[in-house]
């Protein structure tokens, strides 16, 4: 009797399948779909990383960003460029502003266009030709009912960056994607709602600031490494650690300089 039990179990199983045939095949199809979906994800993830790496390398996305509450001078940028492991450094400006369009206000991050790092990818229109022209991200036009050729007004508030921009009104001459923003989040702000909704790109000459707010670095050897690899992370972490003592020294010098200017 014990030797015949497996056959009986098999017979019962087959009978159950015949009696519930539609449910059985439904489960089989669902299982097959789940396996195919998982296999697709496993195959797609590496391809997505490769595509992202090519895009970021093509737009020369910075490897490190250096910021200072007191700003960064040309001397600071030059000092960073002289450090071992640094391939290139470019200073840049960024400031939060309220973009005013008719009766609608939005908090935007205003960033300076750079020609060696963080290159924008044009979607429509052209690059700005003077200090009163700007690029915006594509969805800025879509969500505000605007078109290329329309004007926006930028208000930086009454704080530290009250006079950071040379003009108030700018003509939109194109839309572009910035490699600095590859997700949906745009960051936080002390202006308006406290949440940045869009980014706007201006030529460097549109800013009226004594010092850079940011310095963007490209690391030696980083271009040859996959962006999402452990080797890349280790390289950038090592460079950041190596730059820290020099950054502390430059911050002290900058602080002393600002205090001396305030006393004069």
List PLM regions with ranges.
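Membrane transport/envelope proteins' first extracytoplasmic loop
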Residues: 2-264
């Amino acid at each position: 009797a014990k030797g015949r039990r497996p056959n009986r179990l098999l017979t019962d199983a087959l009978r159950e399948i015949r009696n519930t045939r539609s449910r059985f095949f439904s489960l089989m199809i669902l299982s097959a779909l789940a396996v195919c979906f998982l296999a697709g994800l496993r195959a797609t993830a590496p391809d997505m990383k490769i595509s992202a790496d090519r895009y970021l390398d093509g737009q020369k996305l910075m490897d490190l960003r250096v910021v200072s509450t007191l700003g960064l001078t040309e001397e600071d940028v030059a000092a960073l460029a002289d450090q071992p492991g640094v391939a290139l450094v470019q200073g840049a400006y960024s400031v939060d502003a309220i973009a005013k369009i008719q009766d609608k206000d939005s908090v935007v991050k205003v960033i300076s266009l750079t020609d060696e790092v963080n290159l924008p990818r044009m979607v429509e229109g052209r690059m700005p030709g003077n200090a009163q022209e700007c690029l915006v991200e594509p969805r800025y036009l879509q969500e505000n009912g605007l078109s290329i050729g329309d004007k926006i007004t930028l208000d930086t508030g009454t704080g530290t960056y009250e006079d950071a921009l040379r003009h108030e009104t700018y003509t939109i001459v194109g839309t572009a994607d910035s490699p600095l923003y590859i997700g949906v989040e745009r960051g936080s702000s002390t202006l308006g709602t406290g949440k940045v909704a869009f980014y706007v790109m201006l030529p460097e000459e549109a800013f009226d600031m004594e010092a850079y707010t940011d310095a963007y670095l490209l690391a030696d050897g980083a271009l040859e490494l996959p962006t999402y690899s452990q080797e890349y992370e280790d390289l950038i972490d090592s460079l950041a650690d190596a730059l820290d003592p020099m950054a502390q020294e430059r911050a002290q010098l900058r602080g002393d300089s600002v205090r001396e200017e305030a006393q004069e």
